[in-house]
Amino acid sequence: MLIISSTQNNEPLAARERAAGELVFIEKDDDAAIKRLKEEADKQDETCEKRMECYLVLKDPTSLWHLQTFGLTKDIERKVDVFATTKEDLLAKTIFVRLPNLQSPFPSLDRAAISRESETTVHLVIVGYSAQAEALAINAALVAHYPNYCRDTRLRTRITIIDDNVLDGRDGLIQRYIHLFDNSYYCSINLKDENPQCIMHRPMYENQRKDFVDVEWEFINGNIHNDAVRQKLTEWSNDCHQQLTIAFCHPDYSRNCNEAFRLPQPIYRNEIPVLCHTTDNELPDCSADKDSYSSVLPFGEKQCDIDTLRMLKKLAQRVNFVYNYCFSLKPGEPITAPSSIDEDVLDSQWKDVGSLTKQYSNIFNAMTLGAKMHSIGRSPKDWKDYYTLTSDEIDVLTEVEHNRWSVEELILGYRPVTPEEQEIVDKDISQKKILRNTKKAHYDLRSFDDLRADSTGKNVNVYDMALCQAIPLIIKSCISE
């Protein structure tokens, strides 16, 4: 079942799903879509082992944030397996996430693999503030985690947003993801000031705890016609230690097309990917010398495909299976990955997760499996025949996974424990779960080398280690012959 909360630019998506035999509802707004979801849930038999699948395409990013952070009512979650998104969020996942069986026309943010010893970092520059800009930014923050940060915490992914009124967008983003930004480095520059200054925000526990957020942010109040912006774009495009991607996301599609071809020339010469948000996935045929602008890539709603979400959920169910396997081991048994995946129990285990927020945690994990394989030099063409990781690869990816998880949890509304709460848990480990469930304070939101033992006496990093061990198994089980 597909429920869409707005007809705006969603007709191609609805038509494809109807043609595939899916039940499709198009509602007038998010409230009507949620009401439709509840009505359909009421028709379902709660005793059925397999729940009805629903892909819920919302209009407002705040509605999506609310569902991801707080979930749905239990009567809906018991009967319907919901994967909520917006068309902007779906499009961002289509662009940034590498999945089995699904070819992407877009280059990865990390076009060259970033290993532990690499000195390069990913830099995403978003021009224009809109719902699509926000979706690209948040999905990049969920995906772009690399091993070299583990060696040098200065090597963070950077997300820069440039807009004539970026300060309003920044404030809304920070208010929505307050715990992410409380614990991140970000700077703001207003080029409209007479003497622009970089105003720097530092993590709330800087110099008290080790750095654990591997994404930093930059908000520039200006546009691509500012000399300072053009100079920076040129510098970044020539920097061999940056893997730069530029995305135009103004609400005005014609402005995106115009500005995508007005960047400093080194950007085109260096073949820096320039993503241009348009209505019909096409750019105007305005240049006789198309090769000079071959790195300008249009993207639009026609590329939204529910198959992206279907594959993500398929992977996420297997991630959940690995976690369940680890927690099913007897006390004293070493935590390790399973040797196979029992596909007969995937749906029932997914239902037993019992929380939409926890399901998103598995989905966000699944979004980075391809990026992790890329960081150890394995491209999608290798996935089918790659059976196991070396112990060194597992060690590296385990730390990357913790860093990824930390950003995910901050996005989902969790925060690190305060010094007082840390003392409480240090004295009584049973308080860890209570604080997590009642205050959304997570004891494990800390640097990798500061992770502690859980109630079983094992360091919590063993679960990430088992999951990384299982990456080839998870991916191979989703590859079609």
What does each model-identified segment do?
Residues 1-342, 347-404, 408, 413-422, ...:
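Cytosolic regulatory regions of ion transport systems
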